[in-house]
Each structure stands twice: as C-alpha cells, then as structure tokens.
A protein has these predicted regions:
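Short amphipathic alpha-helical segments with heptad-repeat character
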Residues: 11-18, 51, 55, 102-105, ...
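Short, contiguous alpha-helical
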Residues: 37-86, 124-183
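A generic structural signal for well-ordered alpha-helical segments enriched in polar/charged residues
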Residues: 22-26, 30, 110-117, 121, ...
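Short, contiguous pre-domain boundary segments
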Residues: 2-9, 91-97
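Alpha-helical bundle segments that constitute or directly flank the non-heme di-iron/ferroxidase center
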Residues: 3-33, 56, 60-67, 147-150
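Solvent-exposed interaction patches of small proteins and small membrane subunits
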Residues: 4-15, 70-76, 103, 140
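Short capping loops/turns at secondary-structure boundaries
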Residues: 6, 97, 101-108, 138, ...
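Acidic/histidine-rich alpha-helical segments that form the ligand environment
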Residues: 83-126
Length: 183
C-alpha cells in the first residue's frame, strides 16, 4: 500500500448493506415464529416492531439519496429542527403493533429495494456532501443501512438464543465484516 486512504464508494456501501441485511434476515428466519410478535426483543419491541423500525430507517437513507439526486441534500434534516428520533421510533413501533407481520415485512422489503436501487445509480461524489444536520451522506447511509442492520442482528441473535449480552466477539466480527466490505 502507498499510504493512500481509499475513498468510500456507493458500491462498497451497497455490498456491505446486502451482507448485513442478509445476516439480519437469516437471524430473523432462525427465530421461532411464535416469538416474532412477542414483546421484549428491544425494550418492549417484538421482531415485528424491529422490522418496521429497520424499514423506516432504510427508507430514511433512501430519502437522503433522493435529496442528493435533486441537489438539495443540505436541506435534508433542516426542514424539521425539532426532529425527535425516539418519538419517530415510538410512532413506527406503535403502527407496527397494529399491523400484521406480513405487511411489515413487505414494507421493509420495499424500503430496502428503494435504497438498493438508489445506491446502484448514485454518484460517489455525493458521499462527502452534508445534510442539514451536518452529517455526510456516507454517515447517513452507513448508520441507517449496514451498521443499523448489523446492530439489530446482534439483538436478534442474542434474544432468540437467550444470550442477553452481546459479546465482545460480536463486536470484533463486526469490525472484520466492515473491513472486508470496504476491501
């Protein structure tokens, strides 16, 4: 290596997203179906609420890309200065509790599909552009995409296996996957 740092690419984020979502869905598929709507996975959320949560934030990342396509990423987040992540998460969970699991799955799948489509067509030069709340597009895409799926895959595996504590080994595995996805 010549000491140069590789610039991030949409392709690398897309590849990482695919890997992490596949791991998330595999963890979900490994679960006893009776547990998918039982509360207690993340706080009072069931897997259904968690899946809706993933769909919402994946859609959030797709919306950030849409704003970048339009040349107005700087407005993303500035239109709601009182944005409350916890309130949004609670609203998403409440709606999910009132929705059947199949519909929640379809909504997450649609949000994921929209993000994949936008990532595949996006310009790498947008990654360093900033949003209205001062994060780069890359930060939004990673936090709402692959990093978010990874975080909640650990939650799923821990809850469904009865291991309430995520281990340091899980964190090391995460770092190795991140390095591999970036390579």
């Amino acid at each position: 290596m010549n000491g140069e740092v590789a610039l991030p690419t949409m392709r690398a984020i897309l590849d990482e997203l695919r890997v992490e979502r596949d791991a998330f869905l595999a963890a979900l598929d490994d679960a006893d179906p009776a547990l998918l709507t039982a509360p207690g996975l993340v706080g009072e959320w069931s897997a259904r609420e968690l899946l809706a949560h993933m769909g919402y934030w994946t859609g959030h990342a797709a919306e950030a890309l849409h704003r970048a396509e339009q040349g107005v990423l700087h407005e993303f987040g500035s239109d709601d200065p009182d944005f409350d992540v916890d309130a949004v998460n609670e609203t998403v969970a409440r709606v999910a509790r009132e929705t059947d699991l199949a519909t929640v799955r379809l909504r997450e799948e649609a949000a994921y599909g929209a993000l994949v489509e936008r990532l595949a067509a996006a310009d790498d030069s947008w990654l360093l552009d900033t949003t209205g709340y001062r994060e780069t597009l890359e930060q939004v895409l990673r936090e709402d995409g692959p990093e978010h799926y990874r975080e909640h895959t650990i939650d799923l595996r821990a809850w469904f296996t009865g291991d309430a504590e995520a281990t340091d080994d899980d964190d090391l595995d995460d770092e190795a996957r991140e390095d591999e996805a970036r390579a």
